[in-house]
Amino acid sequence: MDKTYAPVTTAQELTEALAKCRAAQEKFATYTQEQVDKIFLAAATAANQMRIPLAKQAVAETGMGVVEDKVIKNHYAAEYIYNAYKDSKTCGVIEEDTAYGIQRIAEPIGVIAAVIPTTNPTSTAIFKTLISLKTRNGIIISPHPRAKGCTIAAARVVLEAAVAAGAPEGIIAWIDKPSLELTNQVMREADLILATGGPGMVKAAYSSGKPALGVGPGNTPAVIDDSADILLAVSSVIHSKTFDNGMICASEQSVVVLDSIYDRVKAEFIKRGCYVLNAEEIDKVRATILINGALNAKIVGQSAHTIAALAGVDVPETAKILIGEVTSTDLSEAFAHEKLSPVLAMYRASDFADAMNKADTLVKDGGYGHTASVYLDTVSGKEKLDAFAEKMKACRILVNTPSSHGGIGDLYNFKLAPSLTLGCGSWGGNSVSENVGIKHLLNIKTVAIRRENMLWFRAPEKVYFKKGCLPVALAELKNYKKAFIVTDAFLYQNGYTKPVEEKLDAMGITHTTFYNVAPDPTLACAREGAAQMAAFKPDLILAIGGGSAMDAGKIMWVLYEHPEADFQDMAMRFVDIRKRVYTFPKMGEKAYFVAIPTTAGTGSEGTPFAVITDETTGVKYPLADYELLPKMSIVDADMMMNAPKGLTAASGIDAVTHALEAYASMMATDYTDGLALRSLKLIFENLPSAYENGAKDPKARENMANAACMAGMAFANAFLGVCHSMAHKLGAFHHLPHGVANALMIDEVLRFNAAEVPAKMGTFSQYDHPHTLARYAEVADYLKLGGTTDEEKLENLITAIDELKAKIGIKKTIRDYGIDETDFLTRLDSMVEQAFDDQCTGANPRYPLMSEIKQMYLNAYYGTDETK
């Protein structure tokens, strides 16, 4: 051992011992796992070999307990703790996941202050020194004054073996002359307190200003149900309660027995050597349990015969337990307290609920958070066990188990960690609610290496396209029985649904049509359609029209399949669509959804988005979830040939903004970039002719149809940005067509996003620096717009967009559309805040401040050169 070790009896000597221990720990912290494990093995071996001498010394010094049982406790503290942690990593990198970029590194805490109780003076010392050595911590022990000799002897055994195996000298120290003053000093100066003792000591530990692992008192009740194995239950309680004369804090303090088996249980206790007190004897023992309201120290760890003699009661020397049949669970009843001796309260319960109530009171009043025990048939009594586990505020619920042995773990259940310090959680005023082990003596550093998100590309299962493809694509639906068509009155009255209806008739599919969809569809409209669906019970839904009809169809689909769905929940904002709080209901279980667009713009046929308006509040609910993706999309330009100019312009420019925002999005990928670029090229080349010539240029119409769908699939996966956020609110507040609103904002957004020094950049792992200017330059290059620098290319792109807007009759400013200036300015702040909170804002490459959104609105209202 350390021959230079000086006794610690004063504050100065303790300060010196702490300094030496801290220096030793700093050296120990550099040891490898192999060195630590060698020391851990040597220390556990030495403690195990000294289990009998230490047990004898503990009983001789304290006058409490049973030598043979203390031998078992010492053996347990050495063998079971070693076995539990021999293969555990506690040095350096203890866990690594290269795929996720995570490393966990274990570091020691430093110097541990260990308070040791008189009830388990050697086994607890062995336990705490071993787990400290395994975790490369130093430890200073404050023994109980009544057990200082045996506690120090146990610590000395572990220290000698550890140093011989290579541990630094002074890594374990102790107070030779314990006092409240020195205990408080060591708790103040240590890095962590590991306190096992009475409530006063635990409270002092938590009041020291240092992190503490303190445990509370136990007052374990054991409920014996009428389904229990009585022989097992009684023998288990006796085995536990007599172990070391009841000094394990988890030992049973009372049994609560159902009335139907009470007499049989009582008889079994008597048969097995327990002594049931009569009324007079109960009073005498009651007066001996508590002295001035506190537990009588003279009964702790004594035999039943000795305690009876103290109370003036004559019992056989062989009596195992003194049992008092009592009725009150109140604190005024001495038998209802923790007794730390072979004295047991016995209660009669009318039924299991009554038994649980009694046990609950006993736990809350005397052992909150510690341990509760129950004996029952775990098969037939499963519901009772579940009820018991739910009701008891105890961190260990032991079933058919002697609680002294069961509570400390690894004896009757091998997943319960072995420990001699049992946490009681917040109920017991503790910071830990489990059996204390090595993980509680480590600081774990987490090294998180940047990783990029998993990306995806989601699209409808089938996308059919080509002018005239409608009847061929519909033929795939031949096995469906009943079709529900969703459209608007204009399309229905002008025969747009007729080709679909004729094909359905030819295939023998019964069908009906809902044609009350209006622009900006409402919840009332969707509910009306869903009610008709519920009555018709289709297995096929066909949404025919522009964005409104397809969105309405999607919402009706949701209401039809999940009438319980809450739109406020479904419209909840998300940062990552895969991590959203709300789980969207599974779609497609009742009906197969087909989208057939009649406009080239919204791209709703290829997106998981839908917007619905609550007509009572005016609130728009934007829904986004891949469950809303159509199962099939049929993009047939024949359905779009006769779209009016205004619709062609608004929907066409909407598709431009879809592609531009998808390309600039933080979540853009190679999969979406190609779609976005190709759709932009097709739009710039074909939108003017589609606008001017309509059906006279079927190729332009077809190219626009394809471009709109491709742009939709691009933003379905890359998402949109702040242009759409502002357009949504501009349209809602001032009733501008959605595509026009986007057209009015896009120039401002391009310049805003292109800033090389943004106030805030967006947050997404793949987005590592502001590069949107370069992205816009790539678009200009792809469109062959010219320019030498990225800045020139951006201006050329904006000019090209402005020229395109002019060709299709879109005005330059918001004011040009007759929006009253006073009304606009009055409602501006509300519009700004709602735009900021729009779902689309999150994917924007530049995270906008509300003041910046406001300025963009003002620029778009007055024109950039005329901004007030």
Could you describe each region identified by the protein language model?
Residues D263, K271, G606-A718:
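Carboxylate- and glycine-rich phosphate/diphosphate-binding segment that chelates Mg2+/Mn2+
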Residues M1-Q103, K271:
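N-terminal Rossmann-like NAD(P)+-binding subdomain of aldehyde/semialdehyde dehydrogenases
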Residues M454-L540, I814-R815:
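ATP/NTP phosphate-donor binding region
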Residues A154, A524-D638:
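Glycine/threonine-rich beta-strand-loop-alpha-helix active-site module
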